[in-house]
Amino acid sequence: MIQKTVLTNGVRILTESMPQMVSSTIGVWVENGSRYEEGPENGVSHFIEHVLFKGTKKRTAAQIAEQVDAVGGVLNAFTGKEYTCYYAKVLGEDLKMTIELLADIFLESVFAPDEIDRERQVVLQEISQAEDTPDDFIHDLFNLHFWQGHPLALPIFGSVETVNHIDRTMLLALMEHRYRANRVFIAAAGAVDHADLVRDCERLFGGITGNGSYAPVTAPDEHLVVLNHAKKLEQAHLCLGGRGVSQVDPLRYAAYVFNTALGGGMSSRLFQEVREKRGRVYSIYSFLSAFLDCGYFGIYAGTSPEWVDEVLEVTLKEIHEVIRHGLKAAELARAKSQLKGNMLLGMESTDSRMNRLARNEIYFGREIPLEEIARGIEAVTNDQVVDLAASCFNPQRMGMVMLGDLKGRELGADVFSALG
């Protein structure tokens, strides 16, 4: 059973009670992420996520960690481009203690200067680790160039330069302006009683006031770009893509189906053609990167430098085949069944249900029933897939980044000419 209550100050409480579960996953969400940062602020939202675990007026950083470990729970957080979440997974009997701990972290952190300086080094190590992980780093590179000049282009972690300039004043200013009642909600799934949680949240979060202030957001423009980023690696990594759909676009169901058929599993076109038939990659997949008002449809592959041209040629050929002929009837049916099956399997976890509650609240402001999603998937036609493929992979609005030791290989925008 899903329930929602809005406190008098505007903080929202969402729960999904799962009586069969003994565990609960609970998150304190704030609708703030790297998208809402100005250039010099890049990385400040993620930095706050780190610092909130470094001590409150009541607890040291060690005591925060010990309190959840003592009951066998998990305490963590993550920052996205449009939201940040502080969450825990515990037994249902420990939920009251956990929400009190999360509230203490969220509302009473002290931002000690020595902890800020220490955590800065941790964040810088996180940036270095990401840059040393090419199959992650290439996605940041693609964003940076495809959406250049827009906040969505910037990495969530920030850069070495911006992180080194973040100080206590910046952190507190962002908290003051954006961690406000109208941007905060609590989501919980599993062994949770809605009325009990509302009472606890009224006591703990009822004092938050005000409305979060943000500069107006606009959708980014796509930039036709083909970039070879030199880095000494054993493999070459490719990321290419074009304009996609937003989280709320009516065509999102067609995008789900196309993505699944093209590169969303072992039976997908790209996996079968590039890996299984040719053995040219270990990893290849397509993906959707979607936000409030925009998105892109991307493809990633990692291969040996001498096989880059072949992998790219086969990938573009498969896209072109869908644009020209659509999906086979069996492919279309299989993609729909795969999507619906994956959706139902995901419902077995309190983590995924809590995240689903939260994302529906952020993007739709309401619960999206599984039946509604299933109907949307089932209603997708081949014509919709063809139109979407042609729109997403328009050669005039595409980008590609290659990462690796690719000396002497220079590709121009005409690389996409195979798409027509």
Where are these regions (language model features)?
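Active/ligand-binding-proximal structured segments within catalytic/core domains
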Residues: 10, 17-68, 142, 179, ...
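Glycine-rich loops and low-complexity Gly/Arg-rich segments
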Residues: 30, 38-41, 51-55, 110-114, ...
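Charge-rich, well-structured scaffold segments of protease-associated domains
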Residues: 6, 17, 61-213, 228-229, ...
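Short, Gly/Pro- and small/polar-rich lid/capping loops
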Residues: 1-11
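His/Glu-based metal-binding/catalytic segments typifying zinc-dependent metallopeptidases
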Residues: 27-29, 213-269, 406
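Double-stranded RNA-binding/processing signature
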Residues: 39, 58, 195, 199, ...
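A generic "binding-loop/recognition-motif" signal
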Residues: 11, 193, 266-267, 407
